[in-house]
Structure formats: C-alpha cells, structure tokens
C-alpha cells in the first residue's frame, strides 16, 4: 500500500518506522515523525497517547515486517540442486535474510533494549513473541530441510545467533565468511563426521586495542558512559550526561575523551573486558551457567555492550571496533568448554557454540523468569551432548 493511501495514524507509524530503520530508535519523536508524515506533532499524542504508545505501534509494524520476511523465505526452501547440504541451504537463507532486512533486525534489537530499560510490559511481551517466532521459523525450516528432530534446536539456535552476531556488519561478503564455516561445522558435529581443525586464532587482548586509562577520573568517566549507555542507549548519550554521572566537569570529560566517538570506543573495549572477565571468573560449571543463562534479565553491562554493537550498524566509525569484538567470539567459550571436559574443540567449535548459545538466550530473553533458566539449561545440556559427546 502506498504511503498516501494510509490513514493519518498509519502514516505516522510508517514515518516513525522509517526513521527508526534509518537512524535508530532514539531518533524517533513526535516531532520527527510528524515532520516526515507532514502532520502536526500533536497528532502523535492524539492518536497514540504518548511516545510509549507510539513506540508500541512502531514495534508492531517491525514485527509484522519480520513475519512477512519469514513467509517469503519459507517460499524459497526448495531451490538449488539436490546435492546442497542442510548447512549450505541454511547459509543461503540466513544470508538472504540479512541482505534484505539487516536493519530490521537491528531495530528489533533496539526494541528489546528499550523494553528492558523502560520496563514496558507490552513492549516486553511483543519482543518475547517476536523472539519465539523467529526461533520457531528456523527450527521448522531445519526440519523441512531434513534435520533430525533432536538437532533442530541446534540449527535454529545457530541461525538466530548468527543473525544477531552479523546484523551490524554491512559487508555481505564478510557476513558470508562467518556464516558458511559455522553452519558447516555444526553439520559436521551433529553428523559425527571428521573435523578438520582450524588454526589457532589470536587472544582477545591481541585483537582489541589497548586502553590503559590515565587515572581514576578517566576510569570513572568510562564507567559513567557504560551506565549511561545501558540506561539510554548510544544515540541519546551525551558527554554532558556522562560528566554529570561521573561527578566531573564537562571539561574533564573532553580532556580525556575528546569526542563522543572516543568515549564510546573506550566504553566498548572496557565492557567487553568486563563481561569476559565475569564469565571467566566463574569458579565452576554452575557459576559459568549462571553467568551465561538469561536468569533475571541481562545485566546492565551486557545490555550496554549490546547497545554499542547495535549502534555500530549505523555508525561507520564504530564498525572496525565492532568487527574486532566479533573476532574474539568464542574465546571465552573455549575456556568454558575446556572446564567442562571438552578437550577436542577448536576455535570454530567455540565460535559456533557461543553463537548457538546466544540464539537460545535470544529465544528465552523475555520468558517468565521462573521458566527460562530451566529451559535454557536443558537445551544447553542436550545440545552440548549432541555436539561434543557426554562429558
């Protein structure tokens, strides 16, 4: 339907949705949406009550678009020659979803953070339904393409995890170089075929830039930026807000971090270090599971790191750092797998496992707290046994 054929409320929703896709959820306001729709800003409050009501309608449209994309993908499952493997076909389908709707996934990720930070129960419920629907689609797709019933959660978890890992990457070729090996390795592990180990990769400390903060003031500023990003996202973060949170002057903030981009980069590196250290500090398997499971919602640090990664989708200056963080994927999981007695895993196995677990967490992120830890643990244990054997 053409924009001009929509009623006034629908035009505002469409305008808000387009702004959110192009510039991020933080750019959506009554003023910006009304300006694009050619309406008065007061029309947003008239139709939707407040910004929260407006965002719910935009989220509903984003979820409808995702459902339409899934339906279109389902119509193309029979393509290709008969010798294509399940891994080949899953690679193609995920690549196509990212090519056609990468920013749509970014926007849904922003809505998840908005739902957690704002505590809007309607946003949370809708985000939960969206996550469940995406996982269910990939599970059913894997079954249609020939996966065994007991393996379908693994294929679905990896698909969802890779969509989340790669939706910030604008280069289709770069995305494909992550997708194809991951699905092939999952297929080999599930099929019990020979594994050709990959070369050892660099440690995270070798990939990410060194950030030795000058003094306690600089460290406080970075921690304040992390807190601000967790609360407000990257787009609404200002150096003035960070200075106030840190209890320092704006001049002190700009002395250590000349631009907002410098501050955001420092926050991303520090967040990655903190989250990784928290996982590795877990003394036993139960501790590791507690850190990785979505019990009680994501921590502020994990949420802030997610917000930074999402910001990189639209901010070219952040993309090299986002790629550097992605290059460390699996480094922590390798240590965790070793602790649990998996001694034959290589770096690709660890990346696949970490990404698959991320997909399971995405499915359960907004599930009832009483249910999600048990569900996550059961799926994790069953899949670990399928991929790596009983340990």
Question: What name fits each language-model region?
Answer:
Residues 1-8, 209-217:
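Short, Lys/Arg-enriched anionic-surface-contact patches
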Residues 11, 21-57, 220, 224, ...:
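Helix-turn-helix
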Residues 54, 58-62, 66-69, 77:
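N-terminal membrane-targeting/anchoring modules of bacterial envelope and secretion proteins
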Residues 60-66, 269-275, 281:
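Short, basic, alpha-helical segments at the C-terminal edge of helix-turn-helix-like DNA-binding modules
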Residues 66, 106-116, 156, 285, ...:
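Short, structured motif recognition centered on aromatic/hydrophobic residues
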Residues 71-105, 277-303:
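Hydrophobic alpha-helical connector segments
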Residues 102-109, 119-144, 299-306, 316-341, ...:
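Amphipathic alpha-helical packing segments from all-alpha helical-bundle domains
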Residues 124-128, 143-199, 319, 323, ...:
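Hydrophobic/aromatic-rich alpha-helical bundle segments in the mid-to-C-terminal region
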